[in-house]
Amino acid sequence: MSAEHSSDIAETIRRIGQQARAAGRALARSGTGARNDALAAIAARIEAGSEAIAAANAADLEAAREAGLDPALIDRMELTPGRIQAMADGLREIAALPDPVGAVRELASRPSGIQVGRMRMPIGVIGIIYESRPNVTADAAGLCIKSGNATILRGGSEAIRSNRAIAEQIRAGLEDAGLPGDGVQVVGTTDRDAVGALIQMPESVDVIVPRGGKGLVERIAREARVPVIKHLDGVCHVYIDEAADTEKAVAIAVNAKTQRLGTCNTMETLLVAEAAAERVLPEVGRQLRDAGIEVRGCERTRALIDEAVPATEEDWTTEYLGPTLAVRVVAGFDDAVAHIERYSSGHTEAIVTESYPLAQRFLREVDSSSVMVNASTRFADGQEYGLGAEIGISTDKLHARGPVGLEGLTTEKWIVLGDGHVRS
C-alpha cells in the first residue's frame, strides 16, 4: 500500500472527526425533546426506506456467499423485514428512556456557603468499531444521539452497503429534527487503515467502543491513543456451594450454559463444592448431555458424569462460545473464589447458595463487572438490568463497568453555585 493511499485515508478520517466534533457540540446543547424527535424521525425514515436497506443488504449477502463466508456470520448480517422493523422499534424504545444529560446529583452546601454538585454531560464523540451485524449501526447511533454524543461508526467490510444505507436514513432523520446530520457518520471505506487512523485521533474522538472478536478488541486496545471501553473474553463462572438448593442449582447451571451458547455472559466453567457434587452433578450432567453439551471435567467430575472427558489447564481459561463446558469440583467457597481469581476474565460470576453470609462474602470478594447470587449469568445484560439498551459490556474498572447504557455514555462535571462568594 502506498504512502499516498494511507495519507488519503488518514485525511478522510481526520475530516470525519472534525465534522463529528462540531456536530457533537450541537448535540450536547440540544434538549431532550429535540433528540427524542430525531430518534422518532430516524425510526420513521428506516421504515420508509426499508426497501432500499433490504436491497443493499441483499447485495452484501450475495457478496458474502460468493466469498464463502461462514453461514453463521451471514445469518448475523441478514436484515429480514422483521429485523429492519426491530431497528425502528428499538430507536423508539431508546427515545422513551430517561435522559441522563443534565441530571444533577449530590448538590450540597459547603461551610463557605457555596453549593457543590455534579452534573452529567455527554462524553463528546464516540467511535464504535464492530463486525458483521448491520443492526448495530442503528442501535449504537440511537444510544449516542439520546445521550447527546456524536458518533463515528466503522462496521465490518462484509456489511458496508447495509451500513451505508442505514446511515443515509439516520442522517436524514437527524436533519428532519433540526440536528446536524454529521452527528452520526459511517466510515465509507473498508480499508483497515481507517481503523488505525480512527483510534489514534484523540483530538477528535473521546472514546472507542469495539464490538467484535477477541482479535479486533486486542488490536484496538494495543494500538489506540483514545480511551477504550471493552471486554476481551467472557469466561463466566457459576459456583454451586454446599449450602445450595439442589433444584435451584441444577436449573441455574443448565440455563447459564444452554439458554444461548454464543454470548459473552454464557457460563463457561462450573465449579461445584465437593459436599454438593454427588447430589448435583449427575442431574446437571444428564441435562447437559440432553442439550448436546460436552463436559470437560476434573477427575472427581468424571466420576459423577460418565460422558465427561478430561479437562486440561487450557479449558479453565477458554471462552468456548459453543457446546462445551469445563467443570471442576472444589473443596469449598475459598477454593472456588481462588479459582475465579486465577482464571476469570472479569465478566460475570454467580454463586448458588442458601447461606446469606457466604452470599455476602461472594459479592464482596469476587472482583468482576457483574456478581450474582442465585441467578443465571445470562442476566448480565443491559436490557435485563433496566438500562433499556447497551452499547456493550466493559470488564475494565474505568470509566464504565459491566453493561454500558446511556449513563455509561456520559461523564460528570463539578458544578458550583454561589452568590458573590469569594475565597478568604
From Swiss-Prot:
Pathway the protein acts in: Amino-acid biosynthesis; L-proline biosynthesis; L-glutamate 5-semialdehyde from L-glutamate: step 2/2
One of the record's GO cellular component terms: cytoplasm
Gene3D superfamilies: Aldehyde Dehydrogenase, Chain A, domain 1, Aldehyde Dehydrogenase, Chain A, domain 2
Enzyme class: oxidoreductase
Catalytic activity: L-glutamate 5-semialdehyde + phosphate + NADP(+) = L-glutamyl 5-phosphate + NADPH + H(+)
EC number(s) from the headed UniProt entry: 1.2.1.41
Biological processes annotated in GO: L-proline biosynthetic process
Keywords from the UniProt entry: Amino-acid biosynthesis, Cytoplasm, NADP, Oxidoreductase, Proline biosynthesis
Pfam entry (one): Aldedh
Stated family: Belongs to the gamma-glutamyl phosphate reductase family.
Role this protein plays: Catalyzes the NADPH-dependent reduction of L-glutamate 5-phosphate into L-glutamate 5-semialdehyde and phosphate. The product spontaneously undergoes cyclization to form 1-pyrroline-5-carboxylate.
Name the UniProt record assigns to this protein: Gamma-glutamyl phosphate reductase
Underlying gene: proA
